[in-house]
Amino acid sequence: TCALPIFPINPHDEGAAISGSIALKGARIDDVVLNRYQEEIEPNSPRIVMFSPLETALPYYADFGWVVDQGIEIELPDGETIWSADRDKLIPSQPVKLSWQNGQGLRFEREIAVDENYMFTITDRVINDGTRSLLLYPYGLISRTDEPDTLGFFILHEGPLGVFDGTLQELTYDDLRDNPAETVQSTGGWIGITDKYWLAALIPDQNIPMTGRFYYTNTGSREKFQVDYLLEGKPLAPAGRIEVTNRLFAGAKVVTLLDQYESDFG
């Protein structure tokens, strides 16, 4: 079978902080390599793989989109959606705009930008060329299959965490196993999963009320740990458009960099 088109992140740039790719099928952020860090000290040691697609041994990815209230019949983009892209690569000076039409009067656009370090900015738009009024809720999620090897240090948190209304909340993987679905209300803040050196974090629009969630499922053979948020619904009238901008950090926990992002984005 022929692989579906992908566009690379920072191709041919040995000095870039990250590399990887985004597949037009699903348009998830699911292939991110940290170029400046290696698994071992040896010169030829593999670079750190931050995110991996579903078909790999240890899937770990971020996804964004829209949902509607139960009972509303409308086709929304999902992991099977084949998007069109206006460019063939993603670099800091050049965002990629994706588009898809659902055949029911809605046009979906997603603009993905990346900075010089580890921050993605995802702007999702919906344009209503149809005759129906709708209420769409933006969401973002980070999904990780199976618990990684952790150091188990008492003083070092590894696992799900978030900041909600200014308060830090940390959960262990065992906490999620014991309580598979926990929700938190907040305006602003962020939610993510941390390792000793690496952090994946969703930073939604800081001015919109959100419901953050820590979520766990077990199929018997694989465990899935998920953090996600659902934002307040956005009404979409005929001939109207709605837009939401969210951010994703996927990289090394460099304190000066994290402090700068906190200053920039709240």
Regions found by a protein language model. Give the residues of each.
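Soluble non-transmembrane domains of integral membrane proteins
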Residues: 1-266
